[in-house]
Design a protein with these regions (language model features):
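An N-terminal assembly and electron-transfer interface module characteristic of large anaerobic redox
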Residues: 1-489
Length: 489
């Protein structure tokens, strides 16, 4: 399915990728149904909590160095700015940059502006963002309130762009448009593809776009690519508008996360002919093998890739074998976004750990290049099937499963789910950094981190003795998926 570059907005994942938030079964069943078009979403008649696509769009764009955000909504819609500023400063710290806050203005829509329109507040917010931050571009993130009342954000953006002479770009990411918060990433990338990225002035055969979040693995990636005669261009966070505008000049695009990079990578390929490397994520041994080999094919560096793989795997072999011995027989549950979840199930297997259940916060039945996610296909091709479920961060389902299965370990990418198994006495590891388990060195570091969590579990043990969980015994006797409704026919 091609991306509609001419549209002002990105189609949500439910309509574009047939994404779902409700499922229980096995990975083989999931992939088989996705491939033949019979996979249906199962709604919940009870939902405890979720997230908002606006936060993903706003958070991702707010880390562009010389851009500003105008969030057109009620003041509460900017509550994410606390976490966004924390994340921004973490990234600045690992780069030894001066610490700054995110450059964001909220239009503070009130009852009056919701009833009579918020256009004047939006104009005021754009002018104030320009005056206060002197940005090279301003992104307007929308909210449920501004969308419901029909404020013409594009018309106001065009009007103010003429006035202040920099790009003023609508990012249509209001929360009610999608139940899948990753749709917010697509909204952000759509704004960049349609308004910021420019046609290439020249092609750079050594330049590789690297789509990521925080970028803590920059030195390792630079080292890897230098062995292949390539140079990474990291994006989108901590890039400038000028750097992003020239991403069409690269020889290829790679991503640390399929869920994140699919829209932008496929969009660059569709619009500018920059090949997007479509493969499993570069976590663990097989992930990095596949990632590098597909990159090598895209840029004609197959021999250099094979030479590097042989050398890198030889260096870690003794340590990896030792780690596997220590982790043999351990059982884990994984709960992450879909691309990370299905990749980390494989990574844990490479470390000698048996994954007894996998949870993903949603599932894309195909990516923008038309294929079922490569990580899911790879997992389904294994001899042993794995029970999995799809839930958009519903902790009541996660805790029910943990209570029944009682794994040795829980691995997640979000603190909101990692804290609960810790309170149940289960050792937990939060994969906050996207470069955890990245490549050959990363899997070694990840293995040691898991060993440490298993051997030093006194915090979880003591918490479990003192904390009463917010669910009564009745719930833990129920099927974890009691509130999943039947498939829509």
């Amino acid at each position: 399915m091609s991306i509609n570059i001419k549209s002002i907005e990105a189609a949500n994942r439910e309509s574009r990728l047939n994404s779902i938030t409700g499922y229980t079964g096995t990975v083989k069943d999931l992939v088989k149904k996705a491939q033949c078009g019979t996979l249906k979403n199962r709604e919940r008649c009870f939902s405890q909590a979720s997230n908002c696509s606006s936060g993903c769009a706003q958070g991702y764009l707010s880390s562009i160095v010389d851009a500003a955000i105008v969030n057109h909504g009620a003041i509460g819609c900017s509550a994410d700015v606390i976490g966004e500023t924390t994340g921004l400063k973490w990234g600045q710290n690992i780069r030894d940059w001066e610490k700054t806050n995110v450059k964001l203005i909220n239009t503070n829509m009130t009852e009056n502006s919701t009833v009579f329109g918020g256009k004047n507040k939006l104009r005021e917010g754009i002018r104030e963002a320009y005056r206060r931050f002197n940005p090279k571009a301003i992104f307007i993130t929308t909210s449920c309130a501004s969308a419901i009342i029909g404020d013409d954000v594009k018309a106001i953006a065009d009007e103010l762009e003429e006035e202040i002479k920099i790009p003023v770009v609508p990012v249509l990411c209001e929360g009610f448009r999608s139940k899948i918060w990753a749709s917010g990433f697509d909204s952000a990338f759509h704004a960049l593809l349609t308004r910021i990225v420019k046609s290439p002035r020249k092609k750079c055969p050594e330049l590789i776009n690297m789509i990521q979040f925080s970028g803590s693995g920059r030195k390792y990636i630079t080292e890897i690519l230098s062995n292949l005669g390539l140079v990474p261009q990291f994006g989108i966070p901590y890039s400038t508008i000028e750097q992003i505008s020239r991403m069409s000049e690269a020889a290829a695009t790679i991503s640390v996360c399929g869920t994140l990079g699919s829209y932008f990578g496929n969009g660059l390929e569709q619009k500018y002919g920059v090949p997007y490397v479509k493969t499993i994520q570069p976590h663990g041994i097989k992930g990095m093998d596949s990632w590098l080999r597909e990159l090598g094919k895209a840029v004609g560096k197959e021999k250099e890739v094979e030479d590097y793989i042989v050398k890198a795997k030889k260096e870690i072999k003794p340590e990896l074998e030792d780690i596997r011995k220590k982790l043999k027989g351990k059982k884990a549950i994984v709960g992450m976004g879909p691309s990370f979840s299905h990749n980390y199930i494989r990574v844990l297997k490479e470390l000698g750990i048996e994954v007894v259940w996998g949870i993903s916060w949603h599932f894309d039945q195909h990516y923008d290049h038309g294929s079922v996610p490569e990580s899911s296909i790879a997992l389904s091709n294994r001899d042993k099937d794995i029970p999995i479920s799809v839930c958009d961060g519903q902790n009541f389902e996660v805790l029910n499963l943990l209570n029944k299965i009682k794994p040795d370990l829980y691995i997640s990418r979000h603190p909101g789910t990692t804290v609960w198994p810790t309170k149940m006495g289960i050792p937990s590891v939060m994969v906050a950094d996207e470069y955890t388990a990245f490549g050959y060195r990363g899997i070694i570091n990840f293995g040691y981190r898991i060993i440490d969590a298993l051997e030093n579990n006194s915090l979880a043990e003591e918490l479990s003795k003192r904390i009463k969980l917010p669910y009564n015994p009745w719930w833990f006797k129920q099927d974890a998926f009691k509130f999943l409704e039947d498939e829509v026919k």
